[in-house]
């Protein structure tokens, strides 16, 4: 088994978000717990149906300027999101390409937010010339 990143990498990322943004996110989640549950259920439903467009809509909602309403540090939040998704997606895509180029047969897993979306692992691999097929619980698209 090989890791894409280790616990230290993840902890450094998670503790790198400005504290004011962490508090803002927690308060937002606690003020609308039903919304958190509904968005998680929608994410799972779209994945189960193999609905890539639906997943992209849900995942891109975090980047909507309206989602930043009340954020105490928009620049800090934007930098954190770039580190959380953009930078990691690029690293994951490179690692996947290395496995593919080596002819290594592996089970390669990352979270849905890293696979899909503009600049996600699937897009980056396609841009590198690989054939990318999205598979949900119901099978291939």
Regions picked out by a protein language model, each given a short descriptive name:
Residues 78-141:
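C-terminal soluble interaction/assembly domains
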Residues 1-101, 138:
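Hydrophobic, often amphipathic alpha-helical segments used for membrane interaction and targeting
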């Amino acid at each position: 088994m090989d890791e894409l990143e280790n616990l230290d990498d993840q902890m450094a990322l998670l503790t790198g978000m400005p504290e004011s943004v962490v508090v803002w996110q927690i308060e937002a989640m606690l003020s609308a717990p039903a919304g958190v549950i509904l968005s998680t259920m929608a994410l799972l439903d779209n994945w189960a149906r193999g609905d890539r467009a639906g997943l992209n809509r849900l995942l891109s909602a975090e980047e909507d300027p309206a989602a930043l309403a009340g954020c105490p540090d928009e620049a800090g939040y934007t930098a954190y999101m770039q580190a959380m998704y953009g930078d990691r997606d690029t690293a994951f895509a490179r690692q996947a390409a290395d496995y593919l180029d080596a002819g290594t047969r592996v089970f390669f897993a990352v979270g849905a937010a890293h696979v899909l979306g503009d600049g996600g692992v699937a897009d980056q691999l396609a841009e590198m010339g690989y054939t990318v097929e999205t598979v949900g619980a119901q099978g291939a698209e």
